[in-house]
């Protein structure tokens, strides 16, 4: 019995390994927030376990007027639908900002669309956030598709 369970675990791990891929990429967004210009860069790296699930980590840099902030962002991406060229995803993420006293954290879900250029390259767009954010010492709902909530970028798979 132990041998059968061990063989099954080896087979499952091999199948996961065959479909798994590392990726790097990043995006950018810009817009106006309360009469202030905002620009942000979002580099990221991650690991695709299979056709449906990926996890990753992002480091971001945001500039609002003359203030510069940084953040870290672990995320998990789930592919809801695809046709081998277009992918509709939902990304669960938690963003932790540093360099700001007013805004500390943001958690929630982001809808995303990816377009496959070839086996290595994809372009993507993330739109908005559905969740909560910690602002000024309080948690409040976060919902929106404003210009600063739309990110476009590229992904490269190894």
Give the predicted meaning of each segment.
Residues 23, 115, 144-158:
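Outer-membrane beta-barrel "beta-signal"
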Residues 32-41, 137-141:
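Surface-exposed strand-loop-strand hairpins of Gram-negative outer-membrane beta-barrel proteins
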Residues 30, 44-123, 155-158:
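Gram-negative (and chloroplast) outer-membrane scaffold detector with strong preference
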């Amino acid at each position: 019995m132990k041998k059968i369970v061990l063989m099954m675990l080896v087979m499952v791990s091999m199948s996961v390994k065959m479909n798994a891929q590392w990726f790097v990429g990043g995006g950018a967004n810009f817009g106006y927030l309360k009469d202030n210009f905002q620009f942000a860069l979002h580099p990221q790296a991650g690991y695709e376990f299979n056709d449906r699930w990926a996890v990753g980590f992002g480091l971001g840099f945001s500039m609002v007027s003359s203030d510069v902030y940084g953040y870290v962002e672990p995320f998990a991406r789930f592919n809801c639908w695809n046709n081998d060229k277009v992918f509709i995803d939902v990304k669960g993420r938690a963003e932790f900002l540093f360099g700001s006293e007013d805004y500390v954290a943001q958690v929630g879900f982001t809808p995303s669309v990816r377009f496959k250029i070839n086996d290595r390259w994809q372009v993507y767009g993330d739109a908005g956030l559905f969740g909560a954010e910690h602002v000024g010492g309080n948690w409040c709902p976060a919902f929106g598709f404003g210009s600063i909530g739309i990110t476009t970028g590229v992904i490269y798979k190894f």
